[in-house]
A protein has these predicted regions:
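An N-terminally biased module of ancient metal coordination in phosphate/nucleic-acid-related enzymes
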Residues: 1-95, 111, 172-184, 208, ...
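Conserved, mostly hydrophobic/aromatic
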Residues: 18, 39, 113, 166, ...
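Non-catalytic positions within long, well-ordered alpha-helices that form the structural scaffold/packing
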Residues: 40, 106, 155-157, 229, ...
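Extended, intrinsically disordered, low-complexity segments
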Residues: 263-277
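Extended substrate/RNA-proximal surfaces in nucleic-acid metabolism proteins
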Residues: 59-199
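Hydrophobic residues within beta-strands of alpha/beta enzymes
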Residues: 47-49, 113, 164, 204, ...
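Active-site-adjacent C-terminal substructures of enzyme catalytic domains
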Residues: 184-249, 258-259, 264-266
Length: 277
């Protein structure tokens, strides 16, 4: 996956490394071929289809058809030779489901493996962070601290992955009645996550959440990208988390500006990866 990027501007994001297609259980409007066409039209040079591999109750037993998915990736590689099309998977809570996650990784070759936390352990139950009815019963500060603590467990868990996805994910679903979310309120917890990622040589993702309101959508917040560099983080991955072709690379202009402001620049070795000096 080595593609030279010399000549690109410092704020230009050339790859979308977090996209879902029809092979993700929560992407009914996903379409891999159409997402490739959209990427080419936008000047994107590489796209990674990081399909969900979730084992929580929210996935309702949905399982990634690895063989079918990889066949579609191969078809798109042939159809779009101008675009680097990468296979990938987004492992949900792999530290809780190590046998399932590890087993999936043996069933095919994945160019990119993301690690994600979409829920947290809350007492004797699991709190799904995207479910408003469950969030309404939760304490926001306790939820965030539980989330950051479990992220450390995920990073240090038995299943290895390359990129930590959408840090600060719960703020996407922040309820109107809660006090505004501020990263600074959780700086110690966030820095512990970043230190764990540095220790395991995991890259941090800047996720634009399909180009939504930056206050809620940018995961993590710009200040956290700066902390990542301060902590010793050297690699930054950028992804839209698109679940349909229309939002491929959405929000990338702002993402590029944030990466550059924090001291990251597009890698001259691996397209899509941003590195610090």
């Amino acid at each position: 996956m080595s593609v030279a990027t010399e000549g690109s501007s410092p704020s230009q994001v050339l790859a979308d490394l977090h996209v879902h297609s029809e092979w993700s259980w929560d992407a009914p409007r996903g379409a891999m071929a159409e997402s490739c066409r959209r990427a080419i039209a936008l000047g994107i040079k590489a796209i990674a289809f990081t399909e969900h591999a979730d084992y929580s109750a929210l996935a309702a037993g949905a399982r990634l058809d690895v063989a079918g998915y990889l066949e579609t990736v191969a078809d798109c590689k042939r159809e779009f030779p101008r675009l680097a099309v990468w296979s990938g998977v987004e492992l949900g809570e792999p530290h809780r489901f190590p046998a399932e996650a590890s087993g999936l990784l043996t069933r095919g070759r994945f160019d990119l493996v993301l690690g994600s936390l979409h829920s947290v352990i809350s007492g004797d139950s699991v709190l799904e962070l995207s479910e408003v009815d469950q969030l309404a019963q939760a304490d926001p500060q306790q939820t965030m601290r539980a989330y950051f603590a479990e992220l450390v467990e995920l990073i240090e868990g038995p299943v290895a992955f390359e990129v930590l996805s959408h840090l600060e994910y719960p703020k996407r679903f922040w309820l109107p009645g809660w006090a505004p979310y501020r990263s600074e309120e959780y700086e110690a917890e966030i820095r512990a996550v970043l230190e764990a990622a540095v220790g395991r040589d995991v890259a941090l993702e800047l996720n634009t959440s399909r180009g939504g309101d930056p206050t809620r959508a940018l995961c993590p917040s710009p200040v956290v990208v700066g902390w990542w560099r301060q902590t010793g983080g050297r690699r930054l991955s950028v992804g839209s988390d698109a679940h349909d072709p229309t939002t491929v690379a959405a929000g990338f202009r702002l993402a590029g500006e944030i990466g550059a402001a924090a001291g990251f620049a597009p890698s001259a070795v691996r397209i899509g990866l941003w590195t610090s000096a």
